[in-house]
């Protein structure tokens, strides 16, 4: 699952006017030197195509400086206080539905950025991938369409649990208006053992750290069958 790697890489070039600045960094994504994917973006090969998508670190990693002139230090586990996650969702949805998101516009950019494509990739794989990505984004973000009923979350904030409800098919049209907004700051996730038994979530409705972490993972697209319990337990 996830976005084809090269399609993800060229989206900011296809629709630069739909971003607040240059590239994904303008939405608060963090890039480490020597890496071509932002922190919190995992990559794996599926059905012969390299695919990328968000993982937990995208919301729970940020940088700090010891002085205004110091080099930023990446700190895992702290809130991603510059990340505009709603902005990212809206950008992807708008770009894949834009008239520019076509094989004629996108494939040449991939060929240029990747150093060249074989005939199979140029004529079949990526043209098909463009249509599949449009359909996939329509399916996923169609479920997350409730974000268009909300005010902008702003950087460092997310409506995680409405996202989880949406992914699992909760009919938002049946929810009372006061339940449509559940936006909260990204939390720090270090020293979680000390939080066991505390009243967790933004409304304090659960006391188990494990449940909080699983619910957050479901909100970013994890599924009960595929979720990595061991990796989540390490935090």
Locations of regions flagged by a protein language model:
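Extended surface/linker regions that mediate inter-domain or inter-protein docking
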Residues: 1-67, 75, 87, 91-235
């Amino acid at each position: 699952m996830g976005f084809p790697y090269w399609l993800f890489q060229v989206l900011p070039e296809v629709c630069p006017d739909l971003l607040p600045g240059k590239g994904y960094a303008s939405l608060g994504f963090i890039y480490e030197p020597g890496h071509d994917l932002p922190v919190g973006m995992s990559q794996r090969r599926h059905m012969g195509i390299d695919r990328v998508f968000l993982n937990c670190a995208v919301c729970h990693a940020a940088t700090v400086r010891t002085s205004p002139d110091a080099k930023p230090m990446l700190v895992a586990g702290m809130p991603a206080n510059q990340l505009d996650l709603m902005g990212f969702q809206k950008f992807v949805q708008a770009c894949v539905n834009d008239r520019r998101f076509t094989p004629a516009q996108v494939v040449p950019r991939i060929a240029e950025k990747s150093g060249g494509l074989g005939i199979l990739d140029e004529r079949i794989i990526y043209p098909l991938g463009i249509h599949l990505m449009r359909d996939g984004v329509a399916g996923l973000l169609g479920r997350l369409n409730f974000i268009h009923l909300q005010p902008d979350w702003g950087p460092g904030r997310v409506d995680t649990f409405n996202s989880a409800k949406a992914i699992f098919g909760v009919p938002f049209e049946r929810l009372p208006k006061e339940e449509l907004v559940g936006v909260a700051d990204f939390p720090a996730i270090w020293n979680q053992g000390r939080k066991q038994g505390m009243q967790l979530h933004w409304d304090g409705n659960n006391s188990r750290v494990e449940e909080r972490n699983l619910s957050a993972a479901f909100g970013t697209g994890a599924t009960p069958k595929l979720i990595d319990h061991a990796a989540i337990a390490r935090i």
